[in-house]
C-alpha cells in the first residue's frame, strides 16, 4: 500500500465553506503551491505526491542528499491510498480531477461527519471529558454560544476572552474581545454567527508556551506519535516549530508547566477520550493543541484545538525522525520567501547535521526552512 499525498492548507477554510467548489484566497493558493513539495519530505518510501512543475535539479539533489523515497505523482495506480493534508469536499475534488476513482475516496456522508468533527465543538467535548476524568482542576473549557448576549456573559465572567469561528485556519477566525469593547465588534460577530451558526468562547490566557500532542487515528483507535512545540504570531498564526527529540520537547513543556504530573495524566487519558469522541469516523493524523499559561490558578490548558488533519507539528516530527542527526536540535520556520529552495547544510547518511534546507523548491512564494544549529 502506498499513499498519494496532497498538501491542501486551505482545508479548514474549505470546511467552513462546506462545498466542493471552493475558491481560496490568493494567499492560501500561494501557500499551497509553495508547500506542494512538503509531502516529499514526510511521506514514506514509495509514496507519491501531487506537486506540479517540480524543479528537476532541486529534486535530484534533495533525493540524493536526504535519501527521499517519495515520488512525484504521474497517474493513479491500484493500491494508492489518498492522503490529503485534510479531508473536505474540496480536497476530494482535487483527487477526482487527478483521476482517483470514487471507490477509494470518502463519500459525501463520511466527509460531512469529518466536517462535523472538525468543528471547534469537538475540542469542547474532549475538554469536558478530560475534566471529568482527571483528579485535578483544569482550565475552563471553551463554550459554544449562539447569541451575542452569551458572548457578553462570557466576557463578564472571564474579563478578556477569545472568540473563535467554528471552522477557520491558523490565525484566522480568532478574535480577542474585551468586555468593555464588545459593541465595537458586535456587527462582525453577528455576521459570523449567521454564516457558521455558532461561536466558541474561552478566556484570554497569559501564554507561556504553545505545544501539541500528536496522534494517528486508525480504525477507531488513537495512537500517540510524539510532541510538538511551536510558535505563533498574534492570535494563532503559525510561524514555526522547534526541531528536537520527543524527550527534549517533553522536558521543555514540563519546565514551562512547572512540573510533569498533570501533563502526564492528560497524555494518559487523551487517547481513549479521542477514540470515544471521534470513533471510526476519521482516520489519519490528528493534533491536540495545548498551552502553558501563567496565573489563574492553573498552568495547563490541555485542549485548545483538536485538528483532524495533518499539522506542521507532524511534518516536523517526521522530518526530525527521518532527516536530522541523532541528538541534534534546531528549528523550522514558515515565512514569505526571499530566496526559496536553499540547500546550505552538511549531511551524513541522509541526515542534516548542520545548516539549513528549504522544503520548498526554488521560485516558491513561501519558504519552509529546517535548520540544525
PLM region spans:
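Peripheral (often C-terminal) accessory segments that flank ATP-dependent C-N-forming ligase machineries
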Residues: 325-373
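ATP-dependent carboxylate/phosphate-activation module, predominantly the ATP-grasp catalytic core
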Residues: 215-272, 307-332
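Conserved N-proximal alpha/beta basic substrate-recognition cap immediately N-terminal to
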Residues: 28-42, 50-156
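Phosphate-binding site of ATP-dependent enzymes
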Residues: 159, 185-239, 292-303
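C-terminal structural cap/anchor segments
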Residues: 282-341
Amino acid at each position: 500500500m502506498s499513499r498519494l499525498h496532497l498538501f491542501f492548507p486551505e482545508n479548514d477554510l474549505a470546511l467552513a465553506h462546506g462545498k466542493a467548489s471552493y475558491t481560496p484566497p490568493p494567499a492560501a493558493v500561494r501557500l499551497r503551491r509553495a508547500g506542494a513539495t512538503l509531502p516529499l519530505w514526510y511521506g514514506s518510501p514509495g509514496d507519491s505526491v501531487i506537486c506540479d512543475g517540480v524543479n528537476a535539479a532541486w529534486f535530484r539533489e534533495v533525493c540524493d542528499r536526504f535519501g527521499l523515497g517519495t515520488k512525484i505523482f504521474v497517474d493513479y495506480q491500484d493500491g494508492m491510498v489518498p492522503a490529503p493534508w485534510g479531508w473536505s469536499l474540496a480536497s476530494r475534488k482535487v483527487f477526482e480531477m487527478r483521476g482517483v476513482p470514487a471507490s477509494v475516496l470518502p463519500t459525501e456522508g463520511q466527509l460531512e461527519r469529518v466536517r462535523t468533527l472538525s468543528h471547534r465543538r469537538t475540542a469542547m467535548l474532549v475538554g469536558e471529558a478530560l475534566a471529568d476524568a482527571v483528579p485535578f482542576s483544569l482550565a475552563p473549557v471553551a463554550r459554544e454560544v449562539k447569541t451575542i448576549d452569551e458572548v457578553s456573559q462570557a466576557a463578564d465572567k472571564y474579563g478578556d476572552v477569545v472568540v473563535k469561528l467554528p471552522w477557520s485556519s491558523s490565525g484566522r477566525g480568532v478574535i480577542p474581545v474585551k468586555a468593555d469593547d464588545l459593541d465595537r465588534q458586535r456587527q462582525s460577530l453577528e455576521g459570523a454567527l449567521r454564516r457558521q451558526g455558532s461561536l466558541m468562547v474561552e478566556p484570554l490566557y497569559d501564554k507561556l508556551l504553545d505545544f501539541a500532542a500528536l496522534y494517528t487515528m486508525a480504525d477507531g483507535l488513537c495512537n500517540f506519535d510524539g510532541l510538538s512545540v511551536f510558535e505563533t504570531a498574534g492570535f494563532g498564526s503559525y510561524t514555526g516549530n522547534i526541531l528536537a527529540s520527543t524527550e527534549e520537547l517533553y522536558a521543555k513543556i514540563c519546565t514551562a508547566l512547572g512540573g510533569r504530573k498533570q501533563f502526564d495524566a492528560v497524555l494518559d487519558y487523551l487517547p481513549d477520550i479521542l477514540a470515544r469522541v471521534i470513533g471510526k469516523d476519521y482516520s489519519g493524523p490528528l493534533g491536540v493543541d495545548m498551552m502553558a499559561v501563567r496565573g489563574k490558578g492553573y498552568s495547563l490548558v490541555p485542549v485548545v484545538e483538536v485538528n483532524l488533519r495533518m499539522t506542521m507539528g507532524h511534518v516536523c516530527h517526521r522530518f526530525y525522525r527521518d532527516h536530522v542527526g541523532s541528538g541534534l536540535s534546531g528549528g523550522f520556520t514558515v515565512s514569505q520567501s526571499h530566496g526559496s529552495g536553499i540547500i546550505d547544510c552538511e549531511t551524513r547518511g541522509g541526515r542534516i547535521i548542520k545548516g539549513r534546507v528549504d522544503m520548498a523548491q526554488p521560485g516558491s512564494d513561501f519558504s519552509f526552512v529546517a535548520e540544525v544549529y
